[in-house]
């Protein structure tokens, strides 16, 4: 048996410390300001220091984590629903419909997602709802491509053909035979997009068109820290470290889910009948 590599335990250990600090920070108030504690350096009273308004940085990191994770998951769900629906529609209707939808996918792929999201979010006035809509309307394409390819590859398989000859409707075939094989294939992409969404949320927050103050958000925290970086560098460094760790954890989950994705794609089996 080979010795475990350092990377096999280092990142999980960092993630565990990350989780413990988040759990502690959630017990603190992220909004309460105290000007007499303004720009306090990290210490026993404030483990990560305070910002220019005297707010606890650890509390804002922890509550910003919840907000960013919630937004990222919401964007993933919306993107999944849109992408799967469009991908399956393209495969099922084929012909001109498939060509038109594929053209839209190609067009969306050729444009940088963050730039389109930036324009949409700014046009919608900023805020969390605008953020969700902008990133969902630009994030569905990858899911749609996988859904379309999976539906095309499975619709002529023996078990799908048998279900069709037995009188199964289009909706039944998609729900009972295509979708169960599609979801495992999307697991790796979901984990990867989770990390990408966190980065995009932070980027839009940094530019001031994402989550609005005084709500805590990592990108907005880094933007607020710019005028004070020379005297209080922890204001930008701490959320930057948490953003990095969060992205690395998402990449680690992507790598591990890749094994399950390969197994799911090797030999699709018919769905088990419900009792």
Describe the role of every protein-language-model region:
Residues 22-25, 72-106, 118:
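Transmembrane-helix boundary motif in ABC transporter permease subunits
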Residues 138, 184, 188-194, 233-275:
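C-terminal transmembrane helix and the adjacent membrane-cytosol boundary/short C-terminal tail
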Residues 76, 88, 126-176, 185-197:
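Membrane-cytosol interface at the C-terminal ends of specific transmembrane alpha-helices
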Residues 1-32, 183, 248, 273:
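N-terminal signal-anchor/first transmembrane alpha helix
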Residues 115-119, 123, 127, 131-132, ...:
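Non-cytoplasmic
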Residues 32-77, 224-240:
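Periplasmic/extracellular loop-to-transmembrane helix junction in inner-membrane transport proteins
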Residues 47, 51, 92-97, 101-154:
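Generic hydrophobic transmembrane alpha-helix motif, especially the helices
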């Amino acid at each position: 048996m080979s010795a475990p590599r350092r990377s096999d335990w280092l990142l999980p250990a960092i993630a565990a410390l990350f989780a413990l600090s988040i759990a502690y920070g959630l017990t603190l108030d992220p909004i309460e300001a105290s000007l007499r504690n303004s720009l306090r350096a990290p210490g026993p009273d404030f483990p990560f220091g305070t910002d220019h308004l005297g707010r606890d940085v650890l509390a804002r990191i922890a509550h910003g984590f919840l907000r960013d994770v919630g937004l990222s998951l919401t964007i993933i769900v919306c993107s999944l629903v849109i992408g799967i629906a469009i991908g399956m529609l393209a495969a099922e209707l084929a012909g001109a419909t498939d060509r038109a939808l594929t053209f839209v996918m190609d067009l969306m792929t050729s444009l940088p997602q963050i730039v389109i999201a930036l324009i949409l979010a700014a046009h919608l006035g900023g805020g969390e709802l605008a953020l969700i809509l902008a990133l969902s309307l630009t994030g569905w394409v990858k899911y749609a491509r996988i859904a379309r390819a999976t539906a095309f590859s499975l619709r002529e398989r023996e078990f799908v053909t048998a279900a069709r000859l037995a009188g199964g409707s289009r909706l039944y075939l998609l729900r009972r035979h295509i979708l169960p094989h599609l979801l495992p294939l999307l697991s790796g992409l979901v984990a990867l997009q989770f990390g990408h969404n966190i980065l995009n949320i932070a980027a839009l927050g940094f530019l001031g068109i994402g989550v609005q103050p005084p709500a805590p958000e990592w990108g907005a925290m880094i933007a607020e820290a710019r005028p004070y970086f020379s005297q209080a560098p922890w204001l930008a460094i701490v959320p930057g470290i948490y953003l990095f760790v969060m992205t690395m954890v998402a990449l680690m989950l992507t790598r591990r889910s890749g094994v399950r994705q390969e197994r799911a794609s090797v030999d699709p089996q018919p769905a088990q009948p419900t009792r």
